[in-house]
Each structure stands twice: as C-alpha cells, then as structure tokens.
Amino acid sequence: MATDDFFSLQREYWRQVAESDGFDIESVQIPPSMYGRINGLIPHNCEINTPLPYRVLGKHYAKLGLHRYNMLKGTKFEFGRLMKFNMLQNCVASFYITLEAYDYGVPGTSHPQTFQVRIDEKIFGSLDLTVSIARRTTDEVTTKKPFIHHYHGGAVADNIIFKGELPDWPSDDVLKDRERFYVIMNESEWRATAWISLYLELVLCAHDKFITNTDLSRLSIEKVAIETSIGDALLYERLEAKSANVYIWFKRLEKPRVPQQVFVTGMDVERKAIIRRVMDSTGYLTLVGKLCGGVTKVRQFN
C-alpha cells in the first residue's frame, strides 16, 4: 500500500472516531487489510465477564470523571458500573470511558444514568492526567471543539503554590500553619470524603497499572492534610477548593512499584503521597501526584 493511501485511511479512521468524540466506535469501519495496522483506539467491553487489562485503572478513571462532574454541578453521583472504554495504543494513553452512575443526592432517584468520561495521561509511570470531558449522555453539548485524540494540556492554576513541580513533604512545623493547612486526624472525616481515597489509589494505579483491587482494599489511611490558598477557611471550603495539595499518610502497602525507585517493604511501613488538584475556568480537572520516600535506582554500566 502506498504511503499516501495509508495516511488517507488513517485520517478517515479518526474522522469516524471524532463523530462520537471517541466514545462509540463500534460502527467505525476500516478495510480488512488495515486491521492491526491502524494506530487507533483499542475497545474494551466491560459487560463481558472475561479478564480485561486495565479494568482497575479504567474504573478509577471513571470515578474521577464523576468526581469532576460533581464538583462542577454540585451533584452527588456515585459510581455504578463500568460499561466500556476505548484506549489509545500508547504507553501514555487516552481513555474514553462509558459508565453508569446513580444520583443518591436526589430522594427517590434509583435509575442509573449513563456518563462519558475522557482522561488524557501526560507522563508514563506517574500520576499526571487531565479530565477534559465528564458528562451525562443526555447533557446538551453546547460547544463542539475540534477532536484531538490525545490532549497534552491541562488545567491552569491561579496561584503559584499550585504551579510547577510538586512540593517536598512539609515539616511538622510547616504543617502547623493553619492559614495553609488543615490536618484531618479523625478517620470519620476523611472517610466521608471518598475522593481522598480515590486520589491515593490513582497515584498507585499510575505507578503500577496492573495493581489489583485486593492490593487497594488493604490500604489504611492514617492522616490527611489539605493545603489551599484560601486562608482561614472552613473544612468543607478547603475540601471543595478548585486548587489544593493533598498530603496523605498511609500503611498496608507491602511493596510499592514505582519506575526507577526502590522502597522499604512491609505492610506496617508508614508511606506518604502528595496529590495536586487543579480545576480551572474551562472545567478541566488536572491531577498530579507522587509516592514519597523512594530511593532512585542507580544504573550500572559494565
């Protein structure tokens, strides 16, 4: 096949994908001779009860999309089930996810609603992603942006505290600054805020995309600190802040798997994670995070 013909078919493939913003590609047609040659999306049907790669990651990305929707709309949708997702064939991937969720914040509402969520990863092996779409399939799409199959941008912070590299872990003295930090010691407080556990699990999923639900279910959060730039604010205001650094102390992770890093092993080892959340006026939600305390591997050359 001539090079021009190949690129023409590649463009036609993405034109068809763009018609549904990447979510419904069952009707996308390509010539049989191009199977396995088109650099496109890999569909995953979660309705079929078979082993599925990235199922845990896809479920967490779906929950993050709902979290973004709830922050924007003031709703209380909760994850129901993962229906399907389409995934870009890259180490740094984009996910186009379809899921069902329930609005438990509205009395008498028991029927599921279908959502679409788009996640674009930015770095391999580390949490750095952006949620650019989180919507119900019944929502009216008022602005149709040009379709780009992998988005490299992110939400823009409005305060220097939340720009650039993630901060180092704060000292005990720094954490005493109540203008910047709110430390949550009470387990009932952070358990009532489901996104704190979600953020931690996303950090671990980003480092190890094949981590299991069993691994995640063992985690025990010990303490949480929320850093914001809104001064003397109430807890709920800090929890709902569009920009925040979240510091989490936790245990019950036997052996962290982080590219090019080595950690002390043991279920009772106290570990630390930092996650930054930024949501801007576009509605984009960007999360960046890392697991602290690792030692960089030294490469040896013979």
UniProtKB/Swiss-Prot annotation:
Pfam families: protein_MS5. InterPro entries: MS5. Keywords: Acetylation. Coiled coil: none annotated. The modification N-acetylalanine is found at A2. Belongs to the UPF0725 (EMB2204) family. This is UPF0725 protein At1g23960.
